[in-house]
Design a protein with these regions (language model features):
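Phosphate/pyrophosphate-binding betaalpha-module
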Residues: 71-118, 123-124
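C-terminal soluble interaction/assembly domains
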Residues: 184-249
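Acidic, glycine-anchored loop motifs typical of Ca2+
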Residues: 137-145
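Extracytoplasmic
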Residues: 1, 23-26, 34-43, 47, ...
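An acidic, Gly/Ser/Thr/Pro-rich helix-cap/linker signature
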Residues: 1-23, 29-32
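Short, functionally critical alpha-helical segments immediately adjacent to catalytic or ligand/cofactor-binding
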Residues: 38-53, 98-101, 156-157
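Substrate-binding/active-site groove segments that recognize
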Residues: 62-74, 120-135, 156
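Secretory-pathway/luminal and periplasmic proteins that interact with or process carbohydrate-rich
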Residues: 50-60, 71-76, 104-110, 124, ...
Length: 249
């Protein structure tokens, strides 16, 4: 984490985020009030995914999805065969979703560009996510995630609110993370998932308490990071989980 942070959270990226927020403050405020997702979170996603729209991908989405759907690279490793098969099936479904999306949104899918995996727009939505979570933010009857900022902001916020399965998505006003204070005799453990499955009492029993006030009924997971000055321990709450559901990386 210490190495990744230095290379990724540069001053230029931070300054770019501030400028982007200032430029789109009114629309971001409206979306934040409607969905309960902070403007800073929405803009951070755009900054991470596409450098605030500076690079949305140069691959033709149709070609990328077709290649991964029918020519997914095989390693020849039997232990990876099942995983590679699932990935191929995933991209076949996304290819079908792309054709449906083109019909619904009147898009020329042959001209769309995006990532090598078929993600599109400033928020890098896959076709299935585009169809399920994109919203018309300005009332013009279309959902444009490439150039219409009201649609882009509202769609990212809507994704946060609705994506999450049985656990649900973003909780307005809820905590994201809190630095953990280690108690004497704390027990080392590393949860296998990002799911916030532990009560504060359970975490306290293991020797981890939040350094800042949080709702007593909140649940969390433990996140361990290799910081510049040694290992860091954080508690990740429901809204942290919602962020990981957008993109684990």
């Amino acid at each position: 984490w210490s190495e990744y942070r230095v290379g990724f959270l540069t001053q230029a990226r931070i300054d770019g985020g501030r400028r982007f927020i200032a430029e789109h403050r009114d629309e971001l405020t409206r979306v934040e009030q409607q969905y309960g997702v902070p403007a800073e979170v929405i803009v951070s996603i755009i900054g991470v995914e596409t450098n605030y729209g500076g690079f949305t991908g140069r691959h033709k989405v149709l070609d990328a999805l077709y290649t991964l759907a029918f020519r997914y690279p095989r390693s020849g490793n039997p232990e990876r065969a099942a995983y590679e098969y699932r990935r191929e099936q995933f991209f076949r479904d996304e290819l079908a979703q792309l054709f449906a999306l083109g019909r619904e949104e009147r898009l020329d899918i042959a001209t769309l560009t995006g990532s090598y995996a078929g993600a599109m727009g400033l928020g890098q939505f896959m076709p299935s996510s585009y169809r399920e979570f994109a919203v018309d933010g300005n009332g013009d009857g279309r959902r444009d995630l490439f150039a219409t900022y009201p649609d882009i902001f509202a769609s990212i916020a809507n994704y946060f609110r609705k994506k999450g399965g049985e656990r649900g998505g973003w909780v307005p006003g809820g905590a994201v993370v809190a630095r953990a204070q280690l108690q004497d005799g704390f027990a080392e453990f590393n949860p296998e998932t990002w799911t916030p499955d532990y009560t504060l009492a359970q975490l306290a029993e293991k020797g981890y308490r939040p350094l800042e006030p949080v709702a007593p009924d909140a649940t969390a997971t433990l996140v361990q990071l290799d910081g510049a000055d040694g290992k860091q321990y954080w508690l990740g709450f429901q809204n942290y989980y919602a962020i990981t559901r957008y993109n684990n990386s």
